[in-house]
Structure formats: C-alpha cells, structure tokens
Amino acid sequence: MSISIRPDEISSIIQQQIEQYDQEVKVANVGTVLQVGDGIARIYGLEKAMAGELLEFEDGTVGIAQNLEEDNVGAVLMGEGREIQEGSTVTATGRIAQIGVGEALIGRVVDALGRAIDGKGDIKASESRLIESPAPGIIARRSVHEPMQTGITAIDSMIPIGRGQRELIIGDRQTGKTAIAIDTIINQKGEDVVCVYVAIGQKASTVANVVQTLQEKGAMDYTVVVAAGASEPATLQFLAPYTGATIAEYFMYKGKATLVIYDDLSKQAQAYRQMSLLLRRPPGREAYPGDVFYIHSRLLERAAKLSDELGKGSMTALPIIETQAGDVSAYIPTNVISITDGQIFLSSDLFNAGIRPAVNPGISVSRVGSAAQTKAMKKVAGKIKLELAQFDDLQAFAQFASDLDKATQDQLARGQRLRELLKQSQNQPLSVAEQVAILYAGINGYLDDIPVDKVTTFTKGLRDYLKSGVNPYFQDVQSKKALGDDEEKALKAALEDYKKTFKATA
C-alpha cells in the first residue's frame, strides 16, 4: 500500500511548528579580563560599554567602567575581587550605578551602595535613584533665605548658614571639625530636617562613636549614616558622598529640608587619585588627576534651595576638608573653597589655647548666610565680629605696649569676655533665644564687671534662669525669632534681676 504524501498538509504542520517555536534569544555585551589587581581590571571586548556602566564579573563582583580606551576598558572594582581570574568573562549590565531610597533609610547605617551594615536587616526601598544625578538648574532654585541653625553661638552669630547653602568646615586634624557637624545634626531635633552623615575613609571605631552619640541624643530618628570605612575599596570611598547626596535628594524633592555632612572630602579626593593613577590617567598638581575639581563641583552643586513650584525642599551641604599645618592654599582646599558659599576655618592654635569651638572669625566667612539669619540674631550679632577682630589686633599690639589708655584697656577687657562667652561645650547646642541673650549681655556691657573666669558660669546660669519661664522673653523670641522693643525690655529686666542674684551668691 503506497503512502500518498500531501505537500500542503506537511507545509501547514511545519508552519504551525514555526509559529509555536519560541526560543528566547539574549544579546549580551560580554568581555574578557586581560589583567586584574589593586582594585582595577582591564577588559577586552565590551565594545558597547557606557562610561560609568556597571559590569558583572564571573564571581559576582561588580565593577564600574571608567576608562573606555581603544583596545580595552578600564574598570574599578566595588569589592575585593579575589576570585576574578585572567581570561574570565565580564558582562555589561546596561545599568548605571543606582541605589534604593525611601523613608526606610532613616535611622539606618548603610554602605556606599545603600546596603544596610547595622545588622538590623535589609532596607525596603520605595524607589531607585541614580547615584550620579544632575544638579538642579537655575530656574529650579531660589535664593537662600531660611536659617539652618547649628546651635553653636560663634557660627550662628558671625558665620550664619542658610538652608540650601554649601558651607565648608576646614582645619587641621583634631581641631573639632566633626564635632561642629555632629552638633549641627543634634540641633535639628524637632526642626523636621532629614540629616545624612557621610563618613569617608574613617576608622570603624570613629563611625561607631558618631552613631552612638547620635543615638544617645535622639538624633538617629531623623538621620541616615553612610559609611565607607578605611578598609573599604577606594571605589566605595569615592562613591559614598554621591550616595549621601542621592539619599538627601530623594527627601529634598519631596519638599523636605535636608542636611548632608561629607566627612571628609580630602579622603574622597585621595581615593579618586588612587583610582586614577591605577587606571594610568595622567597626573597633575599634587598627583591628582585633571578632573579632581569636577568630582567635588558636581557633588556640591547638587545642594540647593528649590523653588516653590518644586516643593520648597532644600539640601544644605557641610563638606569637611582636612588641611596640613593650616595650609589652605593646597590644591584640594582651594578647590573646595572656590566651590562653596563660604568656610568655617578652625585654628589649631585657638583649639590648643582652650577656645572651643576653635573658629577663627578673621578667615571664616559666609557669603550668602546673612540673608537667612534670624532678625533677633542680626540685631545683636552685627557688632560682634568687628569687636573680636579689633580685640585680636589690640591684643597683638598690647604685648609690646607698656601703658595703655583706659579706652584700650576697656576694649581688651570686653574682647576677653566676648571670646569667653563664645566658648561652648561639645554636643550642647543652644537655642536662638539663649544665643541672643548671651550675645546681648556681652555687647551691651552686662559682663564688663564680671571676672573673666566667671563668664561661663554667668552665661550658663542666665540661660537656666531664662528657660525657667520667670520672664516672658524666652518663649517670645523662640516663637517670633525677632527681638522687638517688648522682648528687649523683658531681656534687660531679666539680665538685671539675674545679675543681682549672681553677684549676691558669687
């Protein structure tokens, strides 16, 4: 029996099979490791790699494409990469570095990639944001006009900071730079400000101490800590500040006020120098690569006070720079000074002389903060910077002059008392009303007959007296942030009453 083959039936079966055939075809951009070591990998292939693209190695290590050269791609590793071997494959992910952000980050300690490192479990992020985001444009911003109170009298009176400002904290090691930053975070309690503290290249014990201080003061309730310690790869130390800015940006675009501390950018620049030299990029001044200015400018330009249309949010940046022997003319300090809106200069001489915070009012400046200063503070702080500057000049002159006239002696005496009342203990920020009261007492001669060694005791007692509610001054100034005639009258009465009590008990 012959089998009759019907071509139309066979062709319809083949067509049916073709239509049902569904094999998934994956197109991958794959390369091969040519060389690996010192946190750097050179990869052959990856023709379509983007600058800054995430690359995945066989052992699961992630890298970032940095150098796109003619015959290879230079990548920096975001991990140890001990298992990566020459000849192993690398896959381009098609993604740029991004982290998960959201309310769940508040109160947590994360690494430079937004992963929890505080042992409290994973963080459920509400959305992802690129680590490298463009800064807000000119139209998206408005001028700085709201105060960012640090709680430190010397700063709030002479070098005021506004929301959306970039104010550099600069000084030698062990002069109290981190202390000022931490005090500022503690002072934001109850102000509805989200704070981000970025620790770059620091010892794990130092970061643990900072976190403990913030927890003890109840400041972790509104703070995120981003840590890339000294033992982390240079890549993560380089990325940590951008991660901090990205977290703050999420809240800023939600209409909140944020504060970011970068502690410190000198170490970020050193990490970037290390990466660049290993990638064989040409070195420039102090062996830093030519674009080291750009790594800081693109970071600090992300700080802004947003316009009303964009929700009135703000990001205030307090970058920290460590100087060597007070040399502010070195490469990185001059770069960051030129990018920021002013600097708080901490002097090791003042610190060693027991003047803490060791703020040098002569070199320190705030270029935009005066527009944000509260009316009450503006009224009392106008004279203080000038008086202190004159005191410094007179003090230098008085060392050589044997007999001084009465006016000069009085000015020197007042200068000593002003300097004394600006001294402040660590982790004890003051409210606006307290600061205004002690400054008012200083510039209006209420301390002139108080011995210099008793000034601190007097001001502490005065603050306690005002807070006790005996006098209406404290509540009025705290709510209005202005020193009108009524408030001034109440303050004068309080000063006279307290001074009598103080003199009677002294």
Curated annotation (Swiss-Prot):
It comes from the Bacteria. ATP binds at G171, D172, R173, Q174, T175, G176, K177, T178. Gene3D superfamilies: 2.40.30.20, ATP synthase alpha/beta chain, C-terminal domain, P-loop containing nucleotide triphosphate hydrolases. Its main location: membrane. PROSITE patterns: ATPASE_ALPHA_BETA. Keywords: ATP synthesis, ATP-binding, CF(1), Hydrogen ion transport, Ion transport, Membrane, Nucleotide-binding, Thylakoid, Translocase, Transport. Transmembrane segments: none annotated. The record marks S364 as: Required for activity. Pfam families: ATP-synt_ab, ATP-synt_ab_C, ATP-synt_ab_N. It is found in: Cellular thylakoid membrane. One of its GO terms (molecular function) is ATP binding. It is a peripheral membrane protein. It catalyses: ATP + H2O + 4 H(+)(in) = ADP + phosphate + 5 H(+)(out). Belongs to the ATPase alpha/beta chains family. PANTHER family: ATP SYNTHASE SUBUNIT ALPHA, MITOCHONDRIAL (PTHR48082:SF2). This is ATP synthase subunit alpha. It comes from Nostoc sp. (strain PCC 7120 / SAG 25.82 / UTEX 2576).
